[in-house]
Amino acid sequence: MADSLKMGNLSLNESQHAPAAPPSNGRAAYIPPHLRQRTMGANVDGAAASPPGPAPGAGAWNGPRNAPRGGNWANANASDFSPRGPNVPNGNISWTPTETQRRPFNPHAYGHPGHGGSYGGSHGSAKGSGDGQWRDGKHIPGPANARLERELFGVPNDPTKQSTGINFANYDDIPVEASGHDVPEPVNAFTNPPLDDHLISNIKLARYQTPTPVQKYSIPIVMNGRDLMACAQTGSGKTGGFLFPILSQAFQTGPSPVPAQASGQFGYGRQRKAYPTSLILAPTRELVSQIFDEARKFAYRSWVRPCVVYGGADIGSQLRQIERGCDLLVATPGRLVDLIERGRISLVNIKYLVLDEADRMLDMGFEPQIRRIVEGEDMPNVNERQTLMFSATFPRDIQMLARDFLKDYVFLSVGRVGSTSENITQKVEYVEDHDKRSVLLDILHTHGTSGLTLIFVETKRMADALSDFLLNQRFPATAIHGDRTQRERERALEMFRSGRCPILVATAVAARGLDIPNVTHVINYDLPTDIDDYVHRIGRTGRAGNTGIATAFFNRSNRGVVRELIDLLKEAHQEVPSFLESIAREGSGYGGRGGRGGRGRGGNATRDMRRMGGNVGGGGPSFGGGYGAPSGSSYGGGAGGYGAPPAYGGGYGGGYGGGSYGNPSGPTGPSSWW
């Protein structure tokens, strides 16, 4: 019965995602020769079997390719529109026939991976990476692949690949504060030195012309061997800030030797245990997938092979991609602990440890897993590796924990971190709950179809209900939340990115870290109870110097964040509605929490605690309350430490469960908290 269900979900496009590495069920993936030729022709010659959707900014939701282009949403219910149904061809899959050819084992490159899809179980195949070699102490890049370059880097003016926006030049005016001794001077261009020539060529392919402020400082800091804690505005290039120097040094120094105790583990050109030299940890599967895509891009034609592992996807396919070679590993903490327990990953060779969205990982209860990975396994100690922490906010307690992970670090604060970008026009509307749908329709009709619209709600049920409502109103919408399967989430994101479905209703899963080009409007249908979450939600627009609009529906049920919301609006020079100020004056008892567990953003969320003379060793103030009554835990009492709460009670989409946050091997089983 299970086989028949799996067969029912197969499509021609899915079978193309891994031509070089057939899945475990060979019968399900078999394609007759005549269909292979037809499929290849559709991709090569452009005669796709099903019509693609319009690019972002197109005038309408289009039907068949030869249908007239309209200027409205009239075709939202066209026969090929199925944002929540199974097996929607995305029209963007490219298949390189030569990738299926068998290649001899290359001891310098660990073998050649199969072709992975955009996301999902075969996501980590890293096609194009690992094609280079390290021979006689030199990096020899692999051959160019025009088709793969188009897939990774797009073409000029490709709406799905965003580099810079109209306000990018204004980034030079953003203040930068670097603290620590002997801070290296910033760089103003992608040049050699300090960067490797091959990395610079890939940066040019991505059409990046000038480093962002965080990149100007992080590149020389990391290249000089220093640890780094970096705070920067969301959308300011943090991913490149750690990938560029890590990959550059990898290209210059080559791979690390496999430990002697690993001898005998090799067979047929593979090894059962991977020994990555770089580890990047991030809280969500979507974020690690995005970082992996960037790593593939900038490791193109190099000897470095990136891999990605996360919960919710088939662990068998992830194990197979690791066996083919893993030099740079992007992972969620839960799945990484699982693979370490299985004896499939060793951290003994780690040179670089990156904690991306570090505050969110600790906030969501990943601290025990992170401490086990960093301190309880075979990872080199803090003095034998470089550790980089990147996020948009670093509250005081997070900085106190950083003392255990970093040594003699440089603290980098770029701009008004923890606040919002002035590239975003913020609007706050007073809307009662029963009026939200009608106001939303008015906004969507007013702003038309240009760009992408991201709508945030608090619960999974609301996400589905609102997307169904918009579909009934002839607006092409889809939803993403934790109750949807991994493939459904991947398909929804792909359709949204490509503009085929330009409205996405999301829970907190997409609130932080995801870099989706051309999001021109973010709507907080349900305001979060935490002002930091609001900052990161609206940060999905106005990225890389582009402009965007953020609209928030506010009523008295949101008065807990009114004071911080007013402060944010003033900081970003936005209009403050009079009703916000009147509600804020109603009583001091409503003052916002300011942050999770009452910690507060305060005035020091972006300041280096080492310069403030504070006691960072315990004995600090109590961070009372914890994360909700059900857990029975609180932050620290008077000792200033984490209480490792086992549950988080209520919040995004029906509660945080047992603290597994996207970790199917955690206490919640196959479900994730969002």
Curated annotation (Swiss-Prot):
The family classification in the record reads: Belongs to the DEAD box helicase family. DDX3/DED1 subfamily.
Disulfide topology: none
Which intervals carry biased composition (Gly residues)?
A: 113-131, 588-603
State the protein's name.
ATP-dependent RNA helicase ded1
> What is recorded about the protein's domains?
The Q motif is unique to and characteristic of the DEAD box family of RNA helicases and controls ATP binding and hydrolysis.
Claim: Signal is one of the keywords in the record: no
Q: Where is the Helicase ATP-binding domain?
A: 219-412
Q: Where is the composition biased (Polar residues)?
A: 89-99
Q: Which GO terms describe its biological process?
A: cytoplasmic translational initiation; negative regulation of cytoplasmic translational initiation in response to stress; positive regulation of formation of translation preinitiation complex; regulatory ncRNA-mediated gene silencing; spliceosomal complex disassembly
Q: Name one GO cellular component term.
A: nucleus
Which PROSITE patterns does the record match to this protein?
DEAD_ATP_HELICASE (PS00039), HELICASE_ATP_BIND_1 (PS51192), HELICASE_CTER (PS51194), Q_MOTIF (PS51195)
Domain named Helicase C-terminal: residues: 423-584
Q: Function of this protein?
A: ATP-binding RNA helicase involved in translation initiation. Remodels RNA in response to ADP and ATP concentrations by facilitating disruption, but also formation of RNA duplexes.
Q: Which positions does the motif DEAD box occupy?
A: 356-359
**What are the record keywords, sorted?**
ATP-binding, Cytoplasm, Helicase, Hydrolase, Initiation factor, Nucleotide-binding, Protein biosynthesis, RNA-binding
Q: Which reaction does it catalyse?
A: ATP + H2O = ADP + phosphate + H(+)
The UniProt entry, under Pfam families, shows: DEAD (PF00270), Helicase_C (PF00271)
Specify where the region named Disordered lies, as residue ranges.
Answer: 45-143, 585-617, 653-674
Please list the residue ranges that the record marks as compositionally biased, kind Low complexity: 57-68, 662-674
Its chief place of residence is cytoplasm
Q: Where does ATP bind?
A: 232-239
Recorded GO molecular functions are: ATP binding; ATP hydrolysis activity; eukaryotic initiation factor 4G binding; G-quadruplex DNA binding; G-quadruplex RNA binding; mRNA binding; RNA helicase activity; RNA strand annealing activity
**Which locations, inside or outside the cell, does it occupy?**
Cytoplasm
Q: Where is this motif: Q motif?
A: 188-216
